Amino acid sequence: MQAFTQHEGLVAPLDRENVDTDLIIPKQFLKSIKRAGFGPNLFDELRYLDHGEPGMDNSKRPLNPDFVLNQPRYQGASVLLARKNFGCGSSREHAPWALTQYGFRAIIAPSYADIFFNNSFKNGLLPIVLGELEVARLFDEVKAFPGFKLNIDLERQVVIAPDGRELGFDIEPFRKYCLLNGLDDIGLTLRQADKIRAFEAERLARHPWLESRPVA
């Protein structure tokens, strides 16, 4: 998992509440459990004018010119600004997969659905919670100033706006540690590899009959 320490990125505003996981990545794209290939279908129903299905050549599909991610000024955005209750609905982990594979490193919103919030951390996506008034102000600024960027300093737990104001946010220490060090569940387990091997060796020495052996 890619570590997250500090990130400056272009902001894209998704100005709607209660964005659910089926809108983030529609159900027909969930047949694969491989963590690859979901970015082109992020917000598929909003992004394209036709109905998307797995295997379609997205480069030939008609784009919705009114959707924020299709507008030239937001191309290359890596910070998503959203409204309250982002990520509600079913608990599909494909939602943060699609967001990160598109290129987003962080989301800023007043609130999130719990399962989406937890899944985001496990996949290197930083979900930042700011107050509704501050989020509303950011929406106004993003829309008013093309090229609007935010600097996110995870170590200091602040979002730095172009005018220099710093917006503090909370994060659990363990989640912060994992993001700073690029550790997902597998990475955390591998940090205990020596202890795991030592336990297995001791177990085998004490209970050798538990080890399966080929029949002669």
Swiss-Prot record:
UniProt key word Amino-acid biosynthesis: yes
Cellular component, GO annotation: 3-isopropylmalate dehydratase complex
Superkingdom of source: Bacteria
EC number per UniProt: 4.2.1.33
Catalytic activity: (2R,3S)-3-isopropylmalate = (2S)-2-isopropylmalate
Membrane-spanning segments: none
InterPro entries in alphabetical order: 3-IsopropMal_deHydase_ssu (IPR004431), Aconitase/3IPM_dehydase_swvl (IPR015928), AconitaseA/IPMdHydase_ssu_swvl (IPR000573), IPMI_Swivel (IPR033940), LeuD (IPR050075)
GO biological process: L-leucine biosynthetic process
Keyword rRNA-binding: no
Pathway(s) it belongs to: Amino-acid biosynthesis; L-leucine biosynthesis; L-leucine from 3-methyl-2-oxobutanoate: step 2/4
Signal peptide (from-to): none
Protein family: Belongs to the LeuD family. LeuD type 1 subfamily.
PANTHER family xrefs: 3-ISOPROPYLMALATE DEHYDRATASE SMALL SUBUNIT, 3-ISOPROPYLMALATE DEHYDRATASE SMALL SUBUNIT 2-RELATED-RELATED
Role according to the record: Catalyzes the isomerization between 2-isopropylmalate and 3-isopropylmalate, via the formation of 2-isopropylmaleate.
Subunit-level organization: Heterodimer of LeuC and LeuD.
Official protein name in the record: 3-isopropylmalate dehydratase small subunit 1
